[in-house]
Amino acid sequence: PTVYERMRVAEVFNGRLAMLAIVGCVYPELLGNGVWFEVWNKVDFYRFALISLQVVAPLEYWRGNGGFGWDGEEKYDRSYPGFDPCNLTTEYTKAAEIKNGRLAMIGMFGLEVQNHVTAQGPVANLIEHLRHPLAANIGANLAHPWPPVAMFATTGHKDGVWFPGAQPPAHLTGEYPADRGFDPLSVAADPTVYARMRVSEVFHARLSMLAIVGSIVPELLGKGAWFEVGNSVDGIKLGFILMAIAAPTEYWRGNGGFNWDKGTADRSYPGFDPLKLTTDYTKREIKNGRLAMTGLLGLTFQYLATGESPLANLAAHFANPVGANITTTLA
């Protein structure tokens, strides 16, 4: 029931956010102000993010420490805390909001895929479809040739490709560490996007490797499972402290820190390497980071499926390999 309650609140929250996002993705294009995926060409992302944090963080801190009376007897519904001057929170409007919110969340995912496949905005795609219904539609886009298959990997992919016999796309040359030639949707065809994705992958890989350690070591030391951390730590206060520390650094970094605007430094490896690890270990870092990101997803699904920690599941499996495994859980 506790998880279900949190999921219902999260669904309403993200549904509202997605509906606003749909309007924000379509309306500017209708007004001739550009498509949604070009917004960062006109807006300083780091300054925008910092302003958003400054506005949201105090409100979230107040909300998590008793705002709306949530710490008391839960008199208020977290999705509908009581502010309703137009009397819109009827049973009908609540159901309609959730349905439209779900549609908007799926729509946002569709806009992302549409951008990678057609490189056009939703309005431009709609106009093209109305002009040529038979030639411009999802079937025509899916019919475009995908990367061909060959018997051997092309020159440059020294570690081979992601699947035996697969032919990598032209924009994945094997130049960068752990490039296995996997990009069926040509997401990285744009060099600028590809550069940003490489930096993002290394960043999240490092974060995930730390998170894996933080998820297992405390349990080994008898400090509880990773999903119980919120019982001993004020998550809102911790998040606020982290944002207060990280925001100035991110703002400085986004405005020329490490000389990134001059293109003189690699964003993933800015030069701090006293142990000389950024030579032979970059490939291993990415591979282990990918494994860690997948592992974190596995820990989450494991908890949702069994309600137990990774070490508890491992101990149960060792005690009864036939009766405690993924097949028995799925059954």
Curated annotation (Swiss-Prot):
Key words of the record: Chloroplast, Photosynthesis, Photosystem I, Plastid
Lineage, uppermost ranks: Eukaryota, Discoba, Euglenozoa, Euglenida, Spirocuta
GO cellular component, one term: photosystem I
Extra remark: The LH35 protein is synthesized as a 100 kDa polyprotein and is entirely imported into the chloroplast where it is subsequently cleaved into 5 mature 20 kDa LH35 proteins.
Pfam families: Chloroa_b-bind
Record's subcellular location: Plastid, Chloroplast
Name of the protein in question: Light-harvesting complex I LH35 proteins
PANTHER family: CHLOROPHYLL A/B BINDING PROTEIN
GO BP: any one term: photosynthesis, light harvesting
Domain of life assignment: Eukaryota
